[in-house]
Structure formats: structure tokens, C-alpha cells
């Protein structure tokens, strides 16, 4: 039996639309073992997945077995230890995919390269901005060029913390893509290119004083804001209470405020404000995970 721990991830980070992603110290665990009988997948709460052939972890495992031309009969997969909120922009799908790939590779006692793991993950997920940090940890820049996945790790100099704010409503990735325009002005494109470029530099050099200007975006967040209740007032409060910057995590509905250091006072103030709103917001503080998916 193999047990894998996979971190949550947050894609985009404001100006880095479909390019930047980071791993967070919030984890799911998946256990995998081969069986002689029918595949059985246990979900959160102990419920069995009756439609397991569409399960992302199962699909990922099969892709690895096919990669190595290995035969199989069935699997016993336990996905019940889940801490990453589903469909909230924190990489729950990426965790399922990466957990399946890393787990199957270990189960077969093989040594698949990072390149091949990423290729399988992106083939399933469609883009690398969540699966890359879920696999590798840290803050990752990634691009897809034809069949190649090219990535680089940002060596974040400061020990930043992140106030993660999660409501009780979901935003589907499909809907969040649908609200985006087909064309952008040159000014908006330059706005994002300049901020994304400087964000990478500021993170790498520990220039926290610049971060206030670098999570702003004109490519996706202005259009997705209407899908998230009270986002403007939440961002204003976070700024008032000392955040270095705020952004939508992935396609939402989770929001993230960046903190220079652990700040219990910020969390308490924001919790008080969030409690005054509807939608059951909860808030917690995390930091970057730098290990990615690991066998435990």
C-alpha cells in the first residue's frame, strides 16, 4: 500500500494568469493498493465512488500503468482524508491527479521523470499552473509549448504567509472561463506583463514593499469579480488591516490575502468582518509548501 500527501495549490496569483501557481501547506492524503477484484474508491465521509472510471485519481493511476505497459486488475483507493475544499480554486482536481501519478509510480517501484509526470498530469488537467506546484512544491512559473511543459521555481526569499478565505459557494471553472473576453487591449496586456514580471523579481529578491502593486490584474479578475459576492469590500478590508496584496485563488471562489508574517490580529479582524457577511466565509493562515507531493 502507498500513501501520498498532496498540497493545495493556488493558481494565477493575480497578474500571472495561467502561468503562476504556488503550493500551500494544506493537504489531502490518498492511499492506493492493487487488488485482485473490482476497483473500490472511498471518498470523504466513507462514501464509495460508484462512477470510479471517471475519478481523476483512478484515471491518473491507469495512465501511469499504461506508460509502463503494466497490467492491472483493480485498485483499492482511499481518498477520505481530504482537507482541500472542493471546487473552491485551491487545486482539488490537481491534487487528485498528482496523487494518482505519484502513488502509481511508487506502487510500481518505478522512477518516472518529473517531465513525464507533468506530461501525464497536464494531459488530464489541460494546463500546468496547478499540477506543477502540486507535484513540485513552492511557487512555480509554467508554460505549455506544444507537447512540452516548461517550468521554473521562484526562490521566494521572504517567509510570506497567506490568509485563505473560503466561502460556502462554488465557482465552476467553466463559468469562470466563460465570463472572460476573447480580446484584450494592448494596455491591459502590458499592465499584466509588467506586473507579472516584477512580481517574480520581487518574490525572488524579498522586495515585499513592492508587492502592494503586483497582484493587480486586468486579464481575469475584473471579469470574475461578479461571480464572488462582496469581493471588493473584502479586499478593501484586507488592505485596511495590512495585507501586502489580495487576489482570487485560481478561478475562485477562494480569496487570498498576502501577509509579511504570521498575523493573528489580521486573521481575527478579517474573521469578524467575514462573519458579518453571508455565504459562510471561513479564514485560516497557511504558508508555502516547498516539497510538493510526497510518499509518507
UniProtKB/Swiss-Prot annotation:
One of its GO terms (cellular component) is cytoplasm. Keywords: Amino-acid biosynthesis, ATP-binding, Cytoplasm, Kinase, Nucleotide-binding, Threonine biosynthesis, Transferase. ATP binds at residues 85-95. It comes from the Bacteria. The keyword Amino-acid biosynthesis applies. It is found in: Cytoplasm. It holds the Pfam family GHMP_kinases_N. InterPro entries: GHMP_kinase_C_dom (IPR013750), GHMP_kinase_C_sf (IPR036554), GHMP_kinase_N_dom (IPR006204), GHMP_knse_ATP-bd_CS (IPR006203), Homoserine_kinase (IPR000870), Ribosomal_Su5_D2-typ_SF (IPR020568), Ribsml_uS5_D2-typ_fold_subgr (IPR014721). GO terms for biological process: threonine biosynthetic process. GO terms for molecular function: ATP binding; homoserine kinase activity. Disulfide bonds: none annotated. The keyword Repeat does not apply. Pathway: Amino-acid biosynthesis; L-threonine biosynthesis; L-threonine from L-aspartate: step 4/5. SUPFAM superfamilies: GHMP Kinase, C-terminal domain, Ribosomal protein S5 domain 2-like. It catalyses: L-homoserine + ATP = O-phospho-L-homoserine + ADP + H(+). It is an enzyme of class 2 (transferase). PANTHER family: HOMOSERINE KINASE (PTHR20861:SF1), HOMOSERINE/4-DIPHOSPHOCYTIDYL-2-C-METHYL-D-ERYTHRITOL KINASE (PTHR20861). Belongs to the GHMP kinase family. Homoserine kinase subfamily. Catalyzes the ATP-dependent phosphorylation of L-homoserine to L-homoserine phosphate. This is Homoserine kinase. It comes from Clostridium acetobutylicum (strain ATCC 824 / DSM 792 / JCM 1419 / IAM 19013 / LMG 5710 / NBRC 13948 / NRRL B-527 / VKM B-1787 / 2291 / W).
